[in-house]
A protein has these predicted regions:
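Sec-dependent bacterial lipoprotein signal peptides
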Residues: 1-17
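Low-complexity, acidic/polar, glycine-enriched regions of mature
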Residues: 19-220
């Protein structure tokens, strides 16, 4: 044991000596940040529809892009623990808006086309549904979620990440999703179905950002 202590002391002195020979001007202070996990409080939380929205973005392979929003019309989450989260969000596709096209006529034409059966066929499928099956805190206020996305009557599993921030016993969520529209029969100029359209092909991946505010259900 005495020999082990001596060896450790010698090694420590060598390390200190080695560090002291470095240029003091080049030394940098290393700070270790303690990231606090977000602990979710059990309960049922309802979406505040007027303060929540879903942002969308899609791209043409030629470089053009469009972005806009759709409105959350209802939704809630039920929290049992930080790893046991389930819920459902319903989106009104008739509320679809486009932000990037400033010309009123062009904007109206695009939205009309997106609502047609070439794309989301909102006459027959007015809503899209996102279900949360489970959620896991992975770092700080960042969570990984497993869920299901339903568009045009077709449901597929989806994995996505997002941040959840507590705000006076309520929560703000910022969720990032990417879905392949071709899986949901949204096939117009699909990159996976057509190869002869050149830069007129529209990318299959559609990006969604769900910005939602939740308030605890006072009746529970």
């Amino acid at each position: 044991m005495r020999l082990s202590i001596i060896n450790i002391t010698i090694i420590g002195l060598l390390l200190i000596t080695g560090c002291s020979t470095k240029d003091k001007n080049s030394s940098k202070e290393v700070k270790v940040l303690n990231v606090k996990e977000t602990k979710l409080n059990a309960g049922i939380y309802n979406v505040l529809e007027g303060s929540s929205q879903v942002l969308w973005e899609c791209e043409w392979l030629g470089g053009a892009r469009h972005d806009g929003s759709v409105q959350l019309v209802s939704g809630s989450i039920e929290i049992s623990s930080s790893s046991d989260v389930n819920g459902k969000f319903i989106v009104d596709l008739n509320s679809m808006k486009c932000f990037d096209l400033k010309n009123e006529g062009t904007n109206k034409k695009l939205i009309g086309h997106l609502k047609s059966d070439d794309f989301f066929d909102v006459t027959n499928y007015p809503n899209a549904v996102l279900e949360l099956v489970s959620g896991k805190n992975i770092s700080g206020n960042e969570f990984k979620f497993n869920g299901n996305l339903t568009i045009k009557g077709r449901t597929h599993p989806i994995i996505f990440k997002g941040t959840v921030t507590e705000n006076n016993l309520s929560y703000d969520a910022d969720l990032k999703l990417i879905f392949d529209r071709s899986k949901y029969d949204v096939r117009y100029r699909s990159a996976s179905l057509f190869s002869d359209l050149g830069d007129r092909i529209i990318a299959d991946d559609v990006k969604l950002t769900v910005k939602a505010k939740f308030k605890r259900d006072s009746k529970i």
